[in-house]
């Protein structure tokens, strides 16, 4: 069993050496002078058998704290949601198991239809006209939205709310360096974008205004009030949104958003360090020919049968690299399929019910913290996340929680100096009353 997972026998080696006309490994590398060859013993452990290797790897994996072994109240862009069991079954099928979008429609109708359904459901959730087949994640989707806005308006200034996810903001700034865009961060006030500060920065040079809905603090941004400011000087209105929240919130498209992006992770994609995720990108029809990424369209063949194809490909870098709207090629088709299967399994009513449960449980948790004497930092309407202030450093608090089998909330002091000792708590539909009560008790006892 020693070499079960590395089937290279001495006979195999000799056959290969004979094929290339040498007698030994030393002869194969005879061109390398002795003076530069490594001398001495290699500091490499002996090979393990497969059972030994599996045992060691399982022991290493057991050191991880994950959402199967711990109760999680950590969100901040990655959430612990229910994933219907059918999701893994479907995406594991060999005809689906790829991250690529198919170039040959005649042999890929099933996958193309699944992607088309993903695009359709994203449009329904966001209230937009066209959605692409996926982006890498929410951050890169938002950055591409900034680039599209600048290219469409021929302007260079991007107004980015400070209440947008910090990592999304970092990605936008990175993407902005190439074309030389100026990114101006707009401060928040009472947990949402400061409209007075936004108004003060608006001028003819603004390509777009970017906000998040719900924002990083879980608060619901007043899109109705932001839209006229964004469009006052013919700029674009860009909204990054949690798609699950759109099961109950008014879609950004109904507030006049030009571009809606986000991360489909809440639908069928496990929460794991480093991803992968699945970004979505939706626009009004006027921007259809400038949207980045792949588009699947519906058509009919010569016999009148419905079919699906990649459409408007002249926008893409594999057709006209120098004139492409984006350099994205391979995307997250497999995760888009997972999101599509999850949304289909839940159905419209299921998505709404799941979103409603998030709201109800998060608000129960907030009231429980208030009853225990905690200060809730922002008092506006929120979805499934809210901010509390502790008397002690959040890193220290979370270490104690981890010892109790609880993954605590996000330490906002890492990104917002004014929010030191503030924790962003996420409560999804999977959290029970008992789990919430336990968190409140543990934090209350530790905060005393």
From Swiss-Prot:
EC number(s) stated in the UniProt entry for this protein: 1.4.4.2
GO BP of this protein: glycine decarboxylation via glycine cleavage system; nucleoside metabolic process
InterPro entries recorded: GcvPA, GDC-P_N, GDC_P, PyrdxlP-dep_Trfase, PyrdxlP-dep_Trfase_major, PyrdxlP-dep_Trfase_small
Gene3D superfamilies: Aspartate Aminotransferase, domain 1, Type I PLP-dependent aspartate aminotransferase-like (Major domain)
GO MF annotation list: glycine dehydrogenase (decarboxylating) activity
Keywords: Oxidoreductase
Cited CDD domains: GDC-P (cd00613)
Source superkingdom: Bacteria
Pfam families membership: GDC-P (PF02347)
Reactions it catalyzes: N(6)-[(R)-lipoyl]-L-lysyl-[glycine-cleavage complex H protein] + glycine + H(+) = N(6)-[(R)-S(8)-aminomethyldihydrolipoyl]-L-lysyl-[glycine-cleavage complex H protein] + CO2
Family: Belongs to the GcvP family. N-terminal subunit subfamily.
Reported function: The glycine cleavage system catalyzes the degradation of glycine. The P protein binds the alpha-amino group of glycine through its pyridoxal phosphate cofactor; CO(2) is released and the remaining methylamine moiety is then transferred to the lipoamide cofactor of the H protein.
Assembly mode: The glycine cleavage system is composed of four proteins: P, T, L and H. In this organism, the P 'protein' is a heterodimer of two subunits.
Protein name, as recorded: Probable glycine dehydrogenase (decarboxylating) subunit 1
Species per Swiss-Prot/TrEMBL record: Anoxybacillus flavithermus (strain DSM 21510 / WK1)
């Amino acid at each position: 069993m020693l070499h079960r997972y590395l089937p290279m026998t001495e006979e195999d080696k000799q056959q290969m050496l004979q094929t290339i006309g040498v007698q030994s490994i030393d002869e194969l590398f005879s061109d390398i002078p002795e003076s530069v060859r490594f001398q001495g013993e290699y500091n490499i452990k002996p090979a393990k058998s497969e059972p030994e290797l599996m045992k060691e790897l399982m022991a290493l994996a057991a050191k991880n704290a994950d959402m199967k072994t711990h109760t999680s109240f950590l969100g901040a862009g990655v959430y612990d949601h229910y994933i219907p069991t059918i999701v893994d079954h479907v995406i594991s099928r060999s005809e689906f198991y790829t991250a690529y979008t198919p170039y040959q429609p005649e042999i890929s109708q099933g996958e193309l239809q699944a992607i088309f359904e993903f695009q359709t459901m994203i449009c329904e959730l966001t209230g937009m006209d066209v959605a692409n087949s996926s982006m890498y994640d929410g951050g890169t989707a938002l950055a591409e939205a900034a680039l599209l806005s600048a290219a469409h308006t021929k302007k260079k200034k991007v107004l980015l709310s400070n209440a947008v996810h910090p990592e999304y903001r970092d990605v936008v700034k990175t993407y902005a360096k190439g074309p030389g865009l100026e990114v101006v961060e707009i401060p928040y006030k009472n947990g949402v974008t400061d409209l007075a500060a936004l108004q003060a920065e608006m001028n003819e040079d603004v390509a777009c205004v970017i906000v998040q809905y719900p924002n990083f603090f879980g608060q619901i941004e007043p899109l109705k009030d932001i839209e006229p400011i964004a469009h006052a000087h013919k700029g674009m209105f860009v909204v990054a949104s949690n798609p699950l929240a759109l099961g109950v919130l008014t879609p950004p498209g109904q507030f006049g958003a030009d571009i809606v992006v986000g991360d489909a992770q809440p639908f069928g994609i496990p929460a794991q360090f480093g991803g992968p995720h699945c970004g979505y990108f939706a626009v009004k029809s006027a921007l259809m020919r400038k949207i980045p990424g792949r588009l699947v369209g519906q058509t009919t063949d010569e016999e009148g049968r419905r079919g699906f194809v990649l459409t408007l490909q002249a926008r893409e870098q594999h057709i006209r690299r120098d004139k492409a709207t984006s350099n994205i090629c391979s995307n997250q088709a497999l995760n888009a399929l997972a999101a599509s299967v999850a949304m289909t399994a839940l159905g419209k009513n299921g998505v709404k019910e799941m979103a409603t449960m998030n709201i109800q449980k998060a608000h129960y948790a907030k009231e429980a913290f208030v009853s225990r004497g905690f200060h809730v930092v922002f008092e506006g309407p929120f979805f499934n996340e809210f901010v509390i202030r502790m008397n002690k450093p959040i890193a220290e608090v979370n270490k104690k929680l981890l010892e109790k089998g609880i993954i605590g909330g996000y330490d906002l002091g890492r990104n917002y100096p004014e929010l030191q000792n503030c924790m962003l708590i996420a409560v999804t539909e999977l959290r029970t009353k008992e789990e919430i009560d336990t968190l409140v008790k543990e934090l209350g006892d530790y905060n005393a």
